[in-house]
């Protein structure tokens, strides 16, 4: 007898489960690494592995089959032009599941689902560069908000707010006019 040989329904209706698979597979191929529960990761992994196997051979029929599972056309292009050729010499096992512990709110078993050739160091460096550029942009905007005079002679910040000084602790609170 073949008991429990199918799939895990994840306590969802069929339509909800299909939408969940599509969303998670799309996110996996977009970001190449997602954090989810262990059970969802194990189910999504099956779909992702099959799609990567199909993406190794770029045919119209394979693209159409992948488009049934992936929401965005740009992600389908990425799958066939980037991810598929990267996995060309691998015969399976394109994804890995890393257990990271239990979620604090409901103690669910949380895991990371990622592509095997995901380069964590490269992604980390890219985010550091973006953070540095955001900090420099924040400094520029904070100078503008700090009270530099505009062309009309008044700061934009002072036009819209009244400053109220609390004498007991010398703290300033901004209050919008008209409220």
From Swiss-Prot:
Protein name according to UniProt: Large ribosomal subunit protein bL17
Summary of subunit composition and partner proteins: Part of the 50S ribosomal subunit. Contacts protein L32.
GO MF annotations in UniProt: structural constituent of ribosome
Compositional bias segments (type: Polar residues): 162-171
UniProt similarity note: Belongs to the bacterial ribosomal protein bL17 family.
Region described as Disordered: 123-179
Organism: Treponema denticola (strain ATCC 35405 / DSM 14222 / CIP 103919 / JCM 8153 / KCTC 15104)
SUPFAM superfamilies to which the protein is assigned, alphabetical: Prokaryotic ribosomal protein L17 (SSF64263)
Example GO biological process: translation
GO cellular component terms attached to this protein's record: cytosolic large ribosomal subunit
Keywords from the UniProt entry: Ribonucleoprotein, Ribosomal protein
InterPro entries xref list: Ribosomal_bL17 (IPR000456), Ribosomal_bL17_sf (IPR036373)
Record-linked Pfam families: Ribosomal_L17
Origin superkingdom: Bacteria
Composition-biased stretches (Basic and acidic residues): 123-161
